[in-house]
Amino acid sequence: SPTINPTDSGYVKMNLAANWKKYDALLLTAVGPDGNEIYTWSWQVKDSKALTATILPIDTKTAVELVEDSVNFSLKANGITAFISKKTGLLVDLANDYSMKMAFRNGPVLVNGKSNFVSVRTGEEGENKIVEATYSGDLKYIRWTMRPDGWLKLDYSYHINADVPFAGVSFDFPESYMLSAKWLGDGPYRVWKNRMQGVTRNTWEKMYNDSRPGIGPWNFPEFKGYFSNINWIQFNSVQGKFLVATDQDDLFVRLFDFYGMSGPQGYPQLPTGNVSFLDAIPAIGSKLALGINNNAGVNG
């Protein structure tokens, strides 16, 4: 590597293997004169769609069942059943023939913007069965697709023409049910819009903790917060495990309530729900606003 003085920049030539693009990630480690590691950078090589495709295949398959009652549509395959509300288009329940029901429900709801339910329809796409709801307002549609292998796919579209601190969708899931989480993405630390450095792309796993700034006992890294560039995340709960994967790049996941200040309400308020999948997150300085000044540039 070249000799680079402090505050200067330069180029490093990396002698990579001819087939390096076939790998999932690229790691670069900087070592000091004493031979000790200074830092390791990591970059995703394959796109998110290619990475997600490697975890989707499941050997067992059954025909997809679509059943309708007075309240819900139910989509079932390979022992997995999803219940979709006929009045809202939202997920209202998840069931598994081999374990207890999951309390992951009431989504996707917009964390910012308006949505007014218009209609819902059912359909088929090859071996898959579909429930699709349309909306007026900022949310355009929600489409649920059940595959024969039991994977439930969610597609949605929204458009917000406003200055908002965060954008995306949320679900409900009780924080008290969580045991641990495992994910492929940046970690192990949480991030903010203006604090994106200091995390490394890898597969991470950590036990649930409720560490908050200024309140002991401290158990770091914090379990709750905004996490960046997530490809998949596995929730390990008292009800069992479930996995959420995406082929979208640059997805943020928000885990639960992580504001540690009491008294005045922080700004901005956390997104609705307990677990969020976001395209934008707020800056850290805004959490000190307390309704007085919400300018992150002033507050830090």
Regions from the PLM with identified roles:
Residues 19, 50-300:
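Beta-strand/loop-rich accessory regions of lumenal/periplasmic or secreted enzymes
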